[in-house]
Amino acid sequence: MNTPNPTPEPAPPVVIVGAGSAGLAAAAALQRRGIHAVILEQGDGVATSWRNRHGELRLNTIRWLSDLPGLRIPRNRGRWVSRDDYIDYLEQFAHHHHLDIRFDVHVQRLDRTPGGWRLTTSAGDQDTDQVVIATGYDQVPWLPDWPGQAEFPHPILHVAQLRRAADLAGQRVLLVGAGNSGVEIAGHLVDAGVDALWVSVRTPPNILPRQIAGTPLHPLTLALRLLPERLRDANARTIARLAFGDLTPHGLPTPIHGPYQRLRTTGVTVAVDQGFVNHLKTTRLHIVTELTKFAGPDAVLRDGQRLQPDIVLAATGFRRGLEPLAGHLGVLNTAGQPRSGPGQPTPDAPGLWFLGYHTAIEGNLRQHPIEARRIARAIAQTRPNNGRGRRGLRSQQPARSSPAGSTQQTTRGDHQSGVARSTRGRETTPTS
């Protein structure tokens, strides 16, 4: 007797790619408008990018301006929320909103169809009317190709590969880059007890204090956002000068462009001080010129100086990594960045949205709900109803249990066709 093929589940009207803060914000915003969305996540839990960051990481935006609508980050998580606490919060958020998340599904390619979009995934093809891509701004670590690096006898790592700063205790570290991630990890490296820390700087960074006299600076950036750019930059320079003084004697001259102009023209955001400047002034770290090449065990700098570090740590930024997914659609610029503005329709690609790819000094986490609401409102205006009528994932795979050792109990979603694991959110109890 032949076993009949299972009937494919009706496809959701919206598919979201990525279960980080941006993807979760999008799903919740759509839910509030009565629109069902399925989130496809290649990892085995929410917040994959956060899980892959070093353990000392904390938000540099204040707690109450970093949460998502509908659930506050608990007060007992402190003013500056830790990586682990933020991951826990996102899990609670997914459970609180009963979001439909399909884990262990890698979206490989996106293509147009006569009636919408088709996603090619590791679990089969998925058809839908609308797609929101929210895979993350800092998705693919970028490492320069320095001459001679193949012969360098010691590790060369991107900061994204570092699990804990304490792992480098007692070592001589050359940190390349003094942007946001470089300034942040430098403080942790000194605190962890590295033997020596050189910070290679090509362009002097804009650095702002996280707080002044115990008062967080983050809310002030919201007040400044209505001013013209030149006045915002002037205010930022004044704040930096009052907080740090002149850092030129310590190897960091005043940047040519203010933080807002630099963000607009280069996409490089401001660095937030978490101890970097104090360590610089007390000579616990040293600024050196740009790394140009390697010569055997030597790291050769632009001014001819040679260092012999035990490890080179590159804080050289990230790429969006969107080319395999959408590069063939003509929706990305030459830098691989979406051509659409924050929360705006994608030119010549109706039904395709990008969320979380535009940084803001006011805080990226604060931006995600703003963009999500814009997208949800626009999608709602295109739908006469919230019915489902397109074909879902075609292949069938058994559902899997939670990862070994997990203390979180997961609940199966109503729709599991073709996915490795589905959840309507983690069974955790939010605290307040």
Please name every model-derived segment.
Residues D44-R72, I207-L224:
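Conserved N-terminal glycine-rich FAD pyrophosphate-binding loop of Rossmann-like flavoproteins
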Residues R72-G78:
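A short acidic, helix-capping loop that chelates divalent metal ions and anchors anionic groups
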